[in-house]
């Protein structure tokens, strides 16, 4: 991880330098656990304390899929998606991950016993998957929560109508 941080802080690192960096097998992330989804059962919303359900875990680095980028997250925020996820309201996000996991072999990797939260980020691209043309290793990026596949014509005029649009880090795993 130190090599990644050194490259990010360097004024001289080029895209090829970032692409050549060794990637760790795991990283630290804020998660909620599937076996704790009932921990707040019977409590009013105001009595649910996110500090009880949020964990700082070492998690395996996920396989990079087509159209995806691996980003070294330098900043993220707590927003309503993070709070909802942490108190399992209005429903547990694990139901979204299970449903998404049934769509394809690639999306199956999202259905895990933990959920890495975060629906926005600022960071530096380390790797890109097949089909990513606008970004390259070393690019500084920000990301927001909307993930749109645009495989259906329903979303071509209005991405909010895409039946496959999801909120990244809320309805998908591997958040920021």
Q: Model segments located where?
A:
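Short, P/G- and charge-enriched loop/turn segments at secondary-structure junctions
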Residues: 15-18, 108-113, 164-171
């Amino acid at each position: 991880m130190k090599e990644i941080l050194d490259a990010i802080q360097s004024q001289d690192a080029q895209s090829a330098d970032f692409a050549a960096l060794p990637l760790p097998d795991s990283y630290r992330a804020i998660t909620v656990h599937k076996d704790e989804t009932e921990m707040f059962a019977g409590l009013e919303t105001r009595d649910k304390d996110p500090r009880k359900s949020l964990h700082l875990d070492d998690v395996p680095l996920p396989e990079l899929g087509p159209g995806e980028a691996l980003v070294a997250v330098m900043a993220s925020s707590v927003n309503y998606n993070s709070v909802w996820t942490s108190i399992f309201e209005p429903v547990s996000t694990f139901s979204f991950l299970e449903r998404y996991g049934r769509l394809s072999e690639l999306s199956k990797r999202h259905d895990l016993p933990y959920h890495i939260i975060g629906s926005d980020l600022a960071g530096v691209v380390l790797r890109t998957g097949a089909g990513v043309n606008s970004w390259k290793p070393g690019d500084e990026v920000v990301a927001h929560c909307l993930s749109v596949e645009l495989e259906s014509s329903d979303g071509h005029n209005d991405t909010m109508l895409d039946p496959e649009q999801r909120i990244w880090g809320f309805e998908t795993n591997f958040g920021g």
